[in-house]
Structures are given as structure tokens and as C-alpha cells.
């Protein structure tokens, strides 16, 4: 710890005789200290370092230091062709690789102005929503264990295995799928995929409700998160928040509804925002509640897609994939609703090369984490753990 200086404070102590009788003690001095949290701290969810300026137990300022996991994604993207960028995109938010690929392919396909087969669109949405649920289960499970609840963590990872098995059966990989490609997907669904997926949805619905009650109705969990890390809606918008973070502040903003990309306009689902029943709108508990509610909506989306997806005998999911990708000169921004918010790619093509001139990734985790100063002001040191967990960061995407 390092001494920064002394601050003068005035404290007021109320005597037992009544609220009107007070003793004022002036000129009490306290030391402002710097406390380093991370980059090895388990509750920072990766190599994140927070430099906390504290006055006793109260946080005056928390400054995040990033870059420990920087892997030069944007520079790599300028050195490989467009299809070769997909494996790099996989490794950004490694808990939601399907969603990463979806966002990147939307951007490139927009640049190429190509039409995607209808069955492929449904396939993309199905695997993305399965991956969204799996990602939310990691967020909820690790959040619980951050606050000392071990059982929900085990429940989350037990059920997450079913989703990873479905994705592995489809793509051949448990993580880093490289499945959604520019113009299509790598493989068609296995023969019994629809039946097994519906069986999973039927099995998991009551489990999701049980998991939701296990935490939102837990007195200790509520006390640790309710009213902690408050973020008003207008401030969240000014910071550029998106995803469950923005919806946790009461703003109905979901790119699946706002942009209506892929087949989402054909699907019936709710944009989840807290109603204030369990939490104070804008606090850490609200952000947790949004993720828990979104699991139910993703299950509904998966069921609808399986019902509406056209069956085509001998379907080739690679039929629309261009053999050689050399877009016309221009620039484009494509985005998608990831489990952690808006993931976007700004791509510039010079019209001559098979490699992008520039590929800029807009990370939702980076933007959400940028508000750490605002979230931590006046909070207690133990509450920093609750705040960081509610952001649900993945440092692979933050640092890129």
C-alpha cells in the first residue's frame, strides 16, 4: 500500500437519547490508500488489474488497467484473408464463439452483398442461442461463486455440458467452433439434432427456473447485490453500454429487435428488462436478473427456429460461400447481439486485396468495463467483487 495523503472529514455521531442531539467531531484525519486488485485476483475474471484509491473501506476511485491479454487481433486481421479471420474472431470472447463468428460474418456479407440460404439463417440463430445460454450459465455460476455460493456454480456447469455436447456434435469442437462461415456454415445439422435439442429444451426449462429462484430469492445473494453498483439509464447510454448491462438499467435495447438481422424479425421473443420486483433498477442484481430471464427467451427462440426451419434433402450449407472473397472498395459496420452486448466489426476494403485494409472490433466488454469508475464510486471494497461479476467481462475480448 502507498500513502497518498491525508483528508479532513467531519463525522456526526447520534446519541442514544434522540436524533436531535448530536455530537460533532471535527478534524478527524484518515489516510487515502492505493490498493491493487489483480491481475491475479480470481474474482477479476482474467488478467484485469484494478488500482483502487480507498478511504478506509470506501472506494474513492477504481482505475482498470488493461492489456495483459493483448493478442494483436486487429493487426492479424490485416495479414490474412477474410475467411482466415474467423478463427481469430473465435478467440476473442471464447465463451461465445458462435456469436462472435455471427457478428463478423454479418459484416463481411454486408460488404459482399450476398444472400444467405434461409435454412442457414435458422441454423445460425439456433447455435448462437445455444451458445448464449451456455455463456449466461458461466456468468451466473461464476458470479455466485464470487459471492460465496458454490452450489449454483455446480448446477450451471452441469447443465452447460448438455449445450457444449450439442455444439460439439454439430461443429466438432467444444469451444472455438469455427462453424459459422462467410456465406454459410461448415456442416449441416446431424440427423437427430432437432429431436435432441428439443429434448434438452424440455429438460432445461424447469432447471432454469430453479436456478433463477436459487439466487434471486436467496437473502444473502440479494443483500450482496441489491443497490450495489447503481447505473442510471442516461449514464449507461452515455457510456455506450449495451446488452444485459444496458437492459439492466431499464433500457429496452436489443440488436436482435432493433436491427432485426437474420430471421429474428420472424421470431416472437421479449426484450428482458428488470421490473424492480427483485432489485433496484440499474444495480448489480438487475444485471443478473436480465441474464437469468434471457435464458428463458433463448429457449423460446430455439424452439421456434426448429419449428420454422425448412427441411431440405441433400442440403449443402456451403453452397453460398464464395470461392474467392475480394469485396469492392468500401467500408461497412456489422454488428450482432452477443451475450455481453453489441459486438461490431468495422471493415474497410481497398477493392484489390483478399485481405481487409482495416478490421476494427467494437468490444462490448471493453465499453462496459470503461464505466468502472462510475460504478465503484463510494462503494465498499468487498462490493467491488459484486460489481465486476455483474459486468461479466471476458478479457480475451476486452484486450483483443
UniProtKB/Swiss-Prot annotation:
From the UniProt record, list the reaction(s) this protein catalyses.
a quinone + NADH + 5 H(+)(in) = a quinol + NAD(+) + 4 H(+)(out)
List where in the cell it is found: Cell inner membrane
GO MF annotation list: NAD binding; NADH:ubiquinone reductase (non-electrogenic) activity; quinone binding
Q: What is its EC number?
A: 7.1.1.-
Protein origin, superkingdom: Bacteria
A GO cellular component annotation here is: plasma membrane
Q: How does it sit in the membrane?
A: Peripheral membrane protein
Q: Does the keyword Metal-binding apply?
A: no
For this protein, the record's SUPFAM superfamilies field holds: HydB/Nqo4-like
Subcellular location, principal = membrane
Write the record's keywords in alphabetical order, separated by commas.
Answer: Cell inner membrane, Cell membrane, Membrane, NAD, Quinone, Translocase, Transport
Top EC class of this enzyme: translocase
- Family under the similarity heading: Belongs to the complex I 49 kDa subunit family.
> What does this protein's UniProt record list under function?
NDH-1 shuttles electrons from NADH, via FMN and iron-sulfur (Fe-S) centers, to quinones in the respiratory chain. The immediate electron acceptor for the enzyme in this species is believed to be a menaquinone. Couples the redox reaction to proton translocation (for every two electrons transferred, four hydrogen ions are translocated across the cytoplasmic membrane), and thus conserves the redox energy in a proton gradient.
NCBIfam families hit by this protein:
PRK06075.1 (NF004739)
Relate the assembly described in the record: NDH-1 is composed of 14 different subunits. Subunits NuoB, C, D, E, F, and G constitute the peripheral sector of the complex.
Q: What is this protein called?
A: NADH-quinone oxidoreductase subunit D
Q: Which organism is it from?
A: Chlorobium phaeobacteroides (strain BS1)
Which gene underlies this protein?
nuoD
Amino acid at each position: 500500500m502507498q500513502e497518498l495523503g491525508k483528508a479532513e472529514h467531519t463525522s456526526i455521531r447520534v446519541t442514544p437519547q434522540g436524533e436531535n442531539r448530536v455530537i460533532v467531531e471535527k478534524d478527524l484525519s484518515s489516510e487515502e490508500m492505493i490498493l491493487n486488485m489483480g491481475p491475479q485476483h480470481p474474482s477479476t475474471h482474467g488478467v484485469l488489474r484494478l488500482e483502487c484509491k480507498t478511504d478506509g473501506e470506501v472506494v474513492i476511485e477504481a482505475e482498470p488497467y488493461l492489456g495483459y491479454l493483448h493478442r494483436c487481433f486487429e493487426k492479424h486481421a490485416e495479414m490474412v484473408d477474410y475467411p482466415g479471420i474467423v478463427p481469430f474472431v473465435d478467440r476473442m470472447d471464447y465463451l461465445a464463439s458462435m456469436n462472435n463468428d455471427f457478428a463478423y460474418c454479418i459484416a463481411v456479407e454486408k460488404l459482399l452483398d450476398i444472400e444467405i440460404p434461409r435454412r442457414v439463417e435458422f441454423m445460425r440463430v439456433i447455435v448462437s442461442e445455444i451458445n448464449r445460454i451456455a455463456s449466461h450459465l458461466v456468468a451466473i455460476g461464476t458470479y455466485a461463486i464470487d459471492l460465496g455460493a458454490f452450489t449454483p456454480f455446480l448446477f450451471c456447469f452441469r447443465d452447460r455440458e448438455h449445450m457444449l455436447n450439442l455444439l460439439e456434435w454439430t461443429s466438432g469442437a467444444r469451444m472455438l467452433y469455427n462453424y459459422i462461415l462467410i456465406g454459410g456454415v461448415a456442416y449441416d445439422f446431424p440427423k437427430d439434432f432437432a429431436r435432441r435439442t428439443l429434448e434438452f429444451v424440455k429438460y432445461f426449462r424447469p432447471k432454469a427456473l430453479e436456478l433463477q429462484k436459487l439466487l434471486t430469492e436467496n437473502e444473502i445473494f440479494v443483500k450482496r447485490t441489491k443497490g450495489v453498483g447503481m447505473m442510471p439509464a442516461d449514464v449507461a447510454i452515455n457510456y455506450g453500454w449495451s446488452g444485459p448491462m444496458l437492459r439492466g438499467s431499464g433500457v429496452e435495447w436489443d440488436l436482435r429487435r432493433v436491427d432485426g438481422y437474420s430471421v429474428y424479425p420472424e421470431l416472437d421473443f421479449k426484450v428482458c428488462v428488470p421490473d424492480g420486483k427483485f432489485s433496484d433498477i440499474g444495480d448489480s442484481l438487475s444485471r443478473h436478473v436480465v441474464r437469468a430471464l434471457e435464458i428463458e427467451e433463448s429457449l423460446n427462440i430455439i424452439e421456434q427456429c426448429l419449428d420454422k426451419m425448412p427441411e431440405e434433402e441433400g442440403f449443402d450449407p456451403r453452397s453460398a460461400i464464395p470461392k474467392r472473397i475480394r469485396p469492392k472498395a468500401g467500408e461497412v459496420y456489422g454488428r450482432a447481439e452477443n451475450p455481453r452486448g453489441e459486438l461490431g466489426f468495422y471493415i474497410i476494403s481497398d477493392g484489390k486485396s483478399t485481405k481487409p485494409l482495416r478490421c476494427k472490433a467494437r468490444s462490448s466488454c471493453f465499453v462496459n468495463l470503461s464505466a468502472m469508475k462510475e460504478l465503484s464510486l463510494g462503494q465498499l471494497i468487498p462490493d467491488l467483487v459484486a460489481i465486476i461479476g455483474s459486468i461479466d467481462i471476458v478479457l480475451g475480448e476486452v484486450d483483443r
